[in-house]
Amino acid sequence: VTETNTNTIPVPADGFIPGPVLLLGAPGVGKGTQAQILMDLWGIPQISTGDIIRENIKQGTPVGREFQDLVAQGIFVPDDLVNRMVQGRLSKPDVGRGYILDGYPRTLGQAEWLDEQLDGPGFPGADGDMTAAGRLPVIAVSIEVRYDELLRRITGRRTGSVSKKIYNIYTHPPLVEGLDDVDGTPLVQRPDDTEEVFAERMKQFAELTAPVIEHYRGLGRFEVVDGEKSVETVTASIATALERLRHRTA
């Protein structure tokens, strides 16, 4: 994750309630970096479907077991099951001021279901009902980067085999080609950091995400920011867009 000085980032006025935030963007645009910065700035959690699924499987919950069974059989996991997992997570008290959605909603059906829930009484659970802030409408921001730049970010990525330090042969190369600055061991490329794998991931992203984007665009709850600027500039652009969208939905 890229380090940044959050003190230099202009953010919405004190008391700003972000509510539910959906960050969209293709693989490599920096969603993870930006999500972490916004979490630190506003003290809100990230709601990751990957984390929720792993936790349900670990705890052996009914939905966790159902998910495992479907995956083992090679059956597509239906929206209803994913929605139930998210519903359980959104019943926790830490979502009161808002949260960042990661990997959800991924389909139009999931987006429509979430909107229906947030427009209703919230998600009653063991910890009580979701607060009014947590039930604000979802607002979505897409971080956009040109395809050729994303390709450079992904295919140029190399990692120290021991230190795990991350490089990019185009933008942040090691001092000696192919060797880790830390210990001189060979750098490695992840098997999925190839042009062929990236092209397939981009195809899947476009097919899944396009309907979700159009859903929120149609509701007037969607904006785009340029992801090719500095980390700080992108964060400031996202914060400004979120404040504008939140005022629009107030």
State where each predicted segment sits:
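Glycine-rich phosphate-binding loop of ATP-dependent small-molecule kinases
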Residues: 1-250
